[in-house]
């Protein structure tokens, strides 16, 4: 289980914690539109690590950190490189207050979080994409007023977005149903290693539709 200060997967956290984050995100979205974002990261040193391709969410992180008053530095490191994860964690602890990292392997990211004392935030792995799903949930919460009884249909093959929606179903009072053509590939639930012990009937993966 991740530390409460880490944000690695949605189902590492309690429902009330996630709902508090979502409501705060709605407030920050309004502040962004009004160009009056609180300086909540004033003086905070943030390492942004892009250990996997892509530019949109890491650019959004960098912009958000700077708009909130933080100092953002892109650290060109790789969790799969020659340096031991424990050694990287020590350097990050010495230099930064928070690390935001986009990396392929969730297992490696968890090892970094275990070795480091600073908070580790998952910007994306190939198994999950919790901040992306949080953004979607914040929009739904703003429009709907609550998440109770929410049923989400995910028309997608196995991937990190589906993985995070499955995490959301385990943590919140929502149901997630995967719908996909049989020609795609086996549902995520067949890979038990990717499922949290918290997963239950709230997540139905593998509903096929070949119409």
Identify the residue ranges that each predicted region occupies:
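Conserved beta-strand segments of alpha/beta enzyme cores
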Residues: 6, 71, 119, 175, ...
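Hydrophobic beta-strand scaffold positions of dinucleotide-using enzymes
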Residues: 21, 99, 210-211
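Glycine-rich phosphate/diphosphate-binding loop of Rossmann-like nucleotide-binding domains
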Residues: 50-63, 143-211
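Residue-level preference for short coil/turn positions at secondary-structure junctions
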Residues: 3, 37, 41-42, 116, ...
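Positively charged, low-complexity intrinsically disordered leader regions
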Residues: 1-57
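Phosphate/diphosphate ligand-binding glycine-rich loop within oxidoreductases
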Residues: 39-141
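Structural motif corresponding to alpha-helix initiation and N-cap regions
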Residues: 34, 82-86, 199
């Amino acid at each position: 289980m991740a530390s409460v200060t880490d944000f690695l997967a949605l189902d590492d956290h309690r429902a009330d914690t996630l709902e508090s984050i979502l409501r705060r995100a709605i407030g920050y979205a309004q502040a962004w539109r009004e160009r009056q974002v609180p300086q909540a990261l004033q003086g905070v040193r943030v390492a942004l690590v892009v250990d996997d391709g892509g530019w949109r969410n890491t650019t959004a992180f960098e912009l958000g950190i700077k708009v909130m008053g933080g100092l953002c530095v892109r650290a060109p490191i790789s969790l799969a490189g020659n340096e031991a994860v424990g050694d990287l964690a020590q350097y990050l602890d010495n230099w930064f207050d928070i690390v935001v990292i986009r990396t392929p392997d969730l297992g490696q990211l968890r090892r970094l979080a275990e070795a480091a004392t600073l908070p580790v935030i998952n910007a994306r792995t190939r198994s999950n994409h919790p901040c992306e799903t949080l953004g979607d949930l914040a929009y739904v919460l703003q429009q709907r007023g609550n998440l109770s009884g929410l049923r989400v249909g995910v028309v997608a093959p196995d991937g990190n977005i589906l993985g995070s929606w499955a995490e959301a179903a385990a943590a919140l009072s929502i149901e997630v149903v995967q719908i996909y053509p049989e020609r795609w590939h086996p549902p995520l639930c067949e890979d038990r290693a990717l499922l949290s012990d918290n997963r239950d009937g709230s997540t139905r993966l593998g509903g096929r539709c070949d119409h």
